């Protein structure tokens, strides 16, 4: 039943019926059946129902089942190879089809279903227009490399999308949220706050949590910054930044410096040259420094708490990642532990779950379940825009 719940959630998150059929190994007709049961009965509708036929002339005999199970224990093969082996060893027995042998192995607990890959939720909003400085910053890690002494280096780079100004080119000791947040905080204090930060879907910028948020991007949301993400496997969405990486590599990494300190010195020299000396054709042969101005939005001394509209019920997330609603707890995600979420009622049963302006999903107050998305027919009934 857990797989069916996950299938339903994946469908609501945008997976097509055909893709789900391949991922979960079920027929499209079966998926439509589960969607109908879920709409009518909620999660309870996904439970197994009796499928015992009144008459089963093709039932596999206990003797055949015993042979199949014994063969599986001896050879860890799939149904096709097992059938060939069994037919050669016992030619007098009418062996069932490969699919039936597969079902016998499945019922005996001798198969392992491949788990579907959990992906970062897609960013469903159009990319922000860029026609001025600090409207969008782009950030990414330049691919790691080793300096002459064998030390691994992971340079974090941040640019202003409009002016191409290289705000940071910094070697971080680790690619985790703590070190990355420290680099961004220093950048915010020097240059002010952008309206949008565009990254890929990797850690620590994004995660598989609802809304695709991570600890780093959650702080951005509190600062009033939109955390914008590229489409999966689409580096062209951050093309300006990738072209800067190509120039950075040609200028500073062929070959790398002797040690990280010297490598950072090389990055600092490149940053100055890139910003103040190198003309950019896209800027009319001006330099980035001639086109960049600090943001009028200063970094506050303390990161503010999120605020919600009056029509939202505000709930604090427990350490275990759940919120209390109508006397029962519903799990959302542990990443939001101790954070305040807004629950905007859509009708008597469904609530939109918000982290500031970011939609995380929907809470079913009757079933006490959280869904990252809702079925199209239900969204239309609730008057929701396409998400």
Where do the PLM segments sit?
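Short, basic alpha-helical/linker "hinge" immediately adjacent to a nucleic-acid-recognition surface
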Residues: 1, 9, 17-73
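Mobile genetic element proteins and their domesticated derivatives, centered on retroelements
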Residues: 7, 20-21, 31-34, 42, ...
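Mobile-element integrase/transposase regions
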Residues: 59, 99, 105-165, 173, ...
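C-terminal, beta-rich DNA-binding module of retroviral/retroelements integrases
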Residues: 271, 275-387
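Acidic/histidine-rich, metal-coordinating catalytic segments
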Residues: 175, 188-209, 231-233, 238, ...
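Charged alpha-helix within mobile-element recombinases
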Residues: 209, 215-300, 342, 346-347
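A structural microfeature
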Residues: 167-168, 361
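Basic, flexible linker segments flanking DNA-binding modules
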Residues: 43-138, 144, 214-217, 287-299
């Amino acid at each position: 039943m857990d797989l069916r719940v996950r299938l339903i959630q994946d469908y609501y998150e945008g997976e097509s019926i055909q893709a789900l059929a391949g991922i979960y190994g079920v027929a499209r007709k079966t998926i439509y059946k589960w969607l109908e049961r879920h709409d009518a009965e909620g999660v309870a509708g996904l439970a197994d129902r009796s499928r015992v036929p009144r008459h089963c002339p093709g039932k596999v005999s206990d003797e055949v089942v015993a042979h199949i199970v014994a063969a599986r224990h001896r050879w860890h093969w799939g149904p096709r190879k097992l059938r060939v082996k069994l037919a050669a060893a016992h030619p007098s027995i009418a062996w069932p089809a490969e699919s039936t042998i597969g079902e016998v192995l499945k019922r005996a607990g001798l198969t392992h279903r491949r788990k579907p890959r959990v992906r970062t939720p897609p960013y469903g909003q159009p990319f922000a227009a860029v026609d001025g400085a600090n409207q969008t910053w782009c950030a990414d890690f330049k691919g790691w490399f080793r300096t002459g002494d064998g030390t691994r280096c992971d340079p974090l780079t941040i640019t202003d999308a409009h002016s191409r100004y290289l705000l940071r080119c910094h070697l971080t000791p680790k690619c985790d949220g703590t070190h990355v947040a420290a680099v961004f905080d220093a950048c915010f204090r020097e240059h002010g706050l952008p309206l949008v930060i565009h990254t890929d879907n990797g850690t620590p910028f994004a995660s598989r949590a609802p809304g695709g948020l991570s600890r780093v991007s959650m702080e951005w949301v509190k600062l009033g910054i939109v955390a914008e993400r590229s489409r999966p496997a689409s580096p062209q969405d951050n093309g300006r930044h990738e072209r800067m990486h190509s120039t950075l590599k040609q200028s500073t990494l062929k070959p790398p410096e002797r040690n990280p300190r010297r490598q950072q010195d090389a990055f600092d020299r490149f940053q100055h040259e890139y910003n103040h000396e190198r003309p950019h054709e896209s800027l009319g042969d001006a330099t980035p420094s001639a086109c960049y101005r600090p943001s009028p939005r200063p970094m506050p001394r303390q990161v503010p708490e999120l605020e919600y509209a009056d029509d939202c019920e505000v709930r604090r997330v427990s350490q275990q990642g759940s919120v209390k609603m109508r006397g029962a707890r519903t799990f959302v995600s542990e990443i939001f532990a101790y954070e305040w979420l807004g629950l905007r009622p859509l009708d008597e049963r469904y609530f939109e779950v918000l982290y500031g302006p970011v939609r995380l999903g929907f809470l079913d107050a009757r079933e006490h379940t959280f869904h990252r998305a809702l079925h199209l027919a239900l969204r239309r009934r609730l008057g929701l825009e396409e998400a």
